[in-house]
Amino acid sequence: MVFVKVRDAEHLEEALKRFKRECEKNGILKEIKRRETYMPPSVKRKIKSQEAQRRMRRTKRKRF
């Protein structure tokens, strides 16, 4: 959970920016988007293997 205390003589917009930055650091928005919809295990496995293949292609390109 992210807490941001508004400092004395600080504008609300600045505190909101700090809050957004902290949320981004902690990966809260990414987690919310990930949990938004149900993904069956078969689809998770498929995506995971596709990402692995993509990584392998990138490393092959970098080696040559």
Curated annotation (Swiss-Prot):
GO BP of this protein: translation
CC annotations in GO: ribonucleoprotein complex; ribosome
Gene3D superfamilies recorded: Ribosomal protein S8 (1.20.5.1150)
Basic residues bias (residue ranges): 55-64
MF annotations from Gene Ontology: structural constituent of ribosome
Pfam families per UniProt: Ribosomal_S21 (PF01165)
Region of interest: Disordered: 40-64
InterPro entries in the cross-refs: Ribosomal_bS21, Ribosomal_bS21_CS, Ribosomal_bS21_sf
Keywords, comma-separated and alphabetical: Ribonucleoprotein, Ribosomal protein
Family under the similarity heading: Belongs to the bacterial ribosomal protein bS21 family.
Protein's recorded name: Small ribosomal subunit protein bS21
Lineage of source species: Bacteria, Pseudomonadati, Elusimicrobiota, Elusimicrobia, Elusimicrobiales
Protein encoded by which gene: rpsU
